[in-house]
A protein has these predicted regions:
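Non-catalytic accessory regions flanking glycosidase/transglycosidase catalytic cores in CAZymes
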Residues: 1-174
Length: 174
């Protein structure tokens, strides 16, 4: 469906290589494969399989954005409850980890046993709200992790960090 050849230079450290693939057809059983000419170790830092054409050019699939638009909702909240709470205070979502180049954003483990890339971050959320002419409702952590999963309250110091993150998010949005 698509192919990209990358000439890799031997290195003892991590090097970034970019490759853009455009599928020439649709195959619901298609696979993404890496092939090497010789024995080597490959470390993948960030892979994104996003469509070339997105809603207003801002990264969201057109069909999903249109579904949201057709709800005629007045606002969208970001992020969701369990994501903002996290499993514990180390992986509770914070504003600063959701902005900047997507390949530099840290991923985090979610309570549903998979990871989020934070590819849809705060900036993309604000852009989506603007594109859909909806109000943005930012949800911040109130100093505790998910109570349904034996979570607990954060220390005063950690809670202050999350409060500062919320203020930074508001400043960013304005």
């Amino acid at each position: 469906l698509g192919r990209c050849n990358i000439a890799v230079q031997q290195s003892s450290g991590y090097r970034r290589y970019d490759c853009e693939l455009t599928a020439v057809d649709t195959d619901f059983k298609g696979r993404f494969s890496l092939c090497c000419d010789s024995d080597c170790t490959v470390t993948l830092g960030f892979i994104s399989l996003m469509p070339e054409k997105t809603f207003k050019g801002h990264g969201l699939r057109e069909d999903l954005a249109m579904m949201l638009k057709n709800t005629h909702a007045k606002f969208i909240r970001f992020p969701g409850g369990c994501v903002v709470e996290g499993i514990n205070e180390q992986n509770a979502l914070s504003f600063s980890r959701t902005i900047g180049p997507v390949w530099e954003r840290p991923s985090s483990q979610l309570m549903w046993h998979y990871r989020t890339t934070n590819g849809l971050g705060f900036h993309e959320f604000l852009q989506l709200c603007e594109d859909l002419e909806m109000e943005a409702m930012y949800v911040c952590n109130c100093g505790m992790s998910c109570q349904a999963r034996h979570g607990g309250g954060f220390s005063d110091e950690e809670t202050k960090k999350y409060l500062e993150e919320a203020l930074n998010a508001l400043e960013y949005a304005l």
